[in-house]
């Protein structure tokens, strides 16, 4: 399916009555979390999703990106800084942040992964187990 056709279909299915998520408020933070169930086949979906792209920080789990993957450059998302904890099949997390959010700390184990981002007044911690 062509990119423009897919985008039109997504926009057509959006609610015409915007909620809090859709309104821009100064001083508000939008945090999204999603089990992506393999990042590679869903990267394009992520890059054109108008709802997710309103988030200031996007936490994804079950990325399935291997530690020895040649590069995470193909998983970059325009307008966001990407951070990955690569563990392999069925595991791993990715965080896309923008604005004042910056990576602070990671915990990486085979059976769980944790990452922490902060904007100075708010910490966003993503735990996948």
Where are these regions (language model features)?
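A shared catalytic/ligand-binding motif for oxyanion handling
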Residues: 1-129
């Amino acid at each position: 399916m062509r990119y423009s056709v897919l985008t039109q279909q997504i926009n057509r299915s959006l609610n015409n009555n915007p909620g809090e998520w859709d309104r821009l408020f100064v001083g508000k933070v939008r945090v999204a979390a999603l089990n992506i169930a393999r990042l590679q086949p869903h990267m394009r979906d992520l890059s054109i999703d108008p709802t997710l792209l309103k988030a200031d920080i996007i936490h994804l789990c079950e990325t399935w990106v291997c530690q020895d993957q040649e590069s995470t450059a193909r998983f970059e998302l325009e307008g966001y800084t990407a951070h990955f904890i690569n563990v392999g099949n069925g595991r791993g997390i990715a965080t896309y942040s923008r604005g004042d959010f910056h990576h602070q700390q990671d915990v990486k184990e085979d059976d769980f992964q944790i990452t922490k981002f902060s904007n100075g007044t708010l910490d966003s911690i993503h735990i996948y187990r």
